């Protein structure tokens, strides 16, 4: 699975091959949203799993205010 992290510094791509690496990313980004880029669907951090067969995830910085 490719994980794309979008933030103030631009974007960073990380290849995630196992659940341990995915869990690290989830822990670091637990206050953010994931988007499944294939579908544009927004998912909560705790719903993301390698078992879903997702090809690419984008991590989006949370919007402040509203």
Predicted regions and their residues:
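Ubiquitin-like/PB1-type beta-grasp interaction modules and other compact soluble beta-rich domains
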Residues: 1-64
